[in-house]
Regions:
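N-terminal mature ectodomain segment of secretory-pathway/periplasmic proteins
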Residues: 39-118, 149-158
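Flexible, processing/modification-adjacent segments and terminal tails
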Residues: 25-39, 46, 108-178, 186, ...
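Gly/Pro-enriched, hydrophobic low-complexity segments
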Residues: 23, 98, 161-261
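Short amphipathic beta-strand/extended segments with alternating polar/hydrophobic composition
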Residues: 76-79, 102-106, 120-128, 183-184, ...
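Positively charged n-region of N-terminal signal peptides that target proteins for export
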Residues: 1-5, 24
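Short, surface-exposed linear segments at secondary-structure transitions and domain or protein termini
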Residues: 85-91, 110-113, 130-134, 192, ...
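Bacterial N-terminal signal peptides
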Residues: 9-18
């Protein structure tokens, strides 16, 4: 369920080792803006499932992941994504070059590359990327985890979202300056966009955007089945879910680092 986040494995495939930075636009929030933003959050929670959504503790998603370059789509890879809240995730990819597995658990993680037959611990930067992906997720916003970090919530206003459509926009600013904006349909309150900025390996500031579509209700929870990622207005990837399961048992062993390459399953 990508309300949680775009799995950081997708960003590894795109070679996005980066540092997120403060977005600089729009006016500062006021107390009134905060109240408006809080009401929007409550409306979104109700729209996507209310208590049923809030009671989701684990997610298993299956589908296709496609990289885009210069406006052209590549050959899709199949994926299985396992999430256990609040901070465990394992994503498995199968493509032309073999299998890739990336697993994160809090402050640790490991990566298996079937093509090169390598099994490595994640670098500190990769772990930090994973943590930032959580902080920029709709789930982190709706479940109120940002409050524990002392982030500031504000109402930005309405934005154009196509013919006769508008999105309500709220913003989170974390104490370290990391800024994320979330757009929700003004009529149905479904998640539509996530916007933030990052710096690439060359120190260049890039605008990132996740666009959500094809919302489907499953087991009482409404989720987007398509998530398109854009960098500086150019599409770089698409996630297309084929199935999503909530609260199915997920073994702890899935997240444990294998003792050797031969032990990878």
């Amino acid at each position: 369920m990508n309300l949680k986040r775009l799995p950081i494995s997708f960003f590894v495939l795109l070679c996005l080792s980066s540092l997120s930075v403060l977005a600089q636009n729009d006016k500062p929030a006021t107390a009134t803006n905060d109240e408006k933003a809080e009401k929007i959050i409550q409306s979104v929670i109700e729209a996507i499932g209310g208590s049923t959504y809030l009671n989701v503790r684990s997610v298993i998603g299956r589908g296709l992941f496609t990289v885009y370059k210069d406006g052209q789509s590549g050959i899709p890879s199949t994926f299985v994504d396992y999430i256990v809240y609040p901070d465990r995730e394992r994503t498995e990819f199968k493509g032309q070059e073999g299998k890739i597995i990336q697993t994160n658990t809090g402050d640790t993680g490991w990566l298996y590359d079937g093509a090169s037959k390598s099994l490595k611990d994640m670098t500190k930067m990769q772990v930090e990327d994973f943590k930032r992906s959580i902080r920029s997720s709709v789930d982190y916003l709706l479940r109120g985890e940002w409050r524990k970090e002392g982030a500031k919530l504000s109402y930005v206003g309405r934005r154009e979202a196509g013919l006769a459509k508008r999105n309500e926009t709220v913003r989170l600013i974390y104490p370290d300056g990391y800024t994320v904006e979330f757009e929700f349909g003004a009529k149905d309150y479904l998640p539509m966009k996530i916007l933030y900025k990052r710096k690439n390996a060359d120190g260049e500031e890039l605008a990132e955007e996740d666009r959500m579509a094809q919302h489907v209700k499953i087991e009482g929870v409404t989720v987007p089945f398509v998530i398109d990622h854009y960098t500086t207005s150019a599409q770089t990837s698409r996630i297309n879910y084929q199935s999503i399961q909530f609260n199915s048992p997920i073994a702890d062993t899935l997240f444990a680092r294998p003792a050797s390459i031969k032990a990878v399953k």
